[in-house]
Amino acid sequence: KNGNQQLLHDVGEQMQMFNAVAGVPAYYQDKLLAVLLLGEKHDGFGFDQQELDFFAALASDVAMAIRNAQLFMDLKKEADKNHDLFIRTMVVLSQAIEVKDKYTHGHTKRVTDIAVLVARQMALNESADFEEEFYENLYIASMLHDIGKIGVPEEVLNKNGTLTKEEYQIVQLHPRHGVEILSPLSELKESLDGVKYHHERYDGKGYPEGLSGEGIPIIAAIISVADAFDAMITDRSYRPGMTKAQAVEEVKRNAGTQFHPVPVKALVELYEKGRL
């Protein structure tokens, strides 16, 4: 009630400024949301009842529009809050695997950063036309691309020597494990292809399904390049990491066989610009 009185008081003070001769209140339920100010009629006569009824109906429509806008903004704030919580949850999930696999510390963030840079460079080259939503799906898929390694025994993940055939087969299951873990979350539907297919090869010799060429979802093809590049430049117990220059040359050499050529081209351009 005090708010309504204050609004009416403010309007009364400003009516002279707007040369208004009357004001029609716009209420939503018992809350005054606005006042529709009426100027003097051209003919100099006062407003008749029909005209006042029209402006009263218009004010009611204005009040409803304002209330709808307020409700929309409230919903958007709530959605943004929930979305931020969702993203933070994804970050926590991605960190879970790094606790288990000591050789991947920082790997997830680096892959995510590189993947998004590659996608934006592809768009800059006009070799791809991504909606903004794609970048978010890529971001999430990159963060969670190795989440399925939670299902791989630590002695296999952290083995210093060469994996046996059986151990390698266990590791190859991690994309499927990742999808099994994440598929109950409907919000991740558009990111699952990146998790499932980031170990597919352009020549069809990858896993888990042996997809090839353009049959590999582009979100997965981008993560594949970013993942491999970071793995190459990272020190492991059994070998030192390559320099970035060496890794870029290795990725280029495998374009069209292991990697989709388009994200490879974007990665090379990023390196040449000093952005990797």
Residue ranges and their predicted role:
Residues 34-35, 149:
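Short glycine-/small-residue motifs
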Residues 62, 68, 75, 79-82, ...:
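Heptad-repeat alpha-helical coiled-coil signal-transmission segments
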Residues 26-29, 41-43:
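Sensor-regulatory modules in signal-transduction proteins
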Residues 56-63:
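Allosteric cytosolic regulatory segments
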Residues 19-27, 34:
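A short, aliphatic-rich beta-strand micro-motif
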Residues 12-18, 46-47:
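Short loop/turn motifs at secondary-structure junctions and domain boundaries
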Residues 6, 42, 49, 78-80, ...:
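Metal-dependent catalytic cores of enzymes that make or break cyclic nucleotides
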Residues 35-45, 51:
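Short beta-strand-to-loop transition segments that serve as allosteric relay/switch motifs
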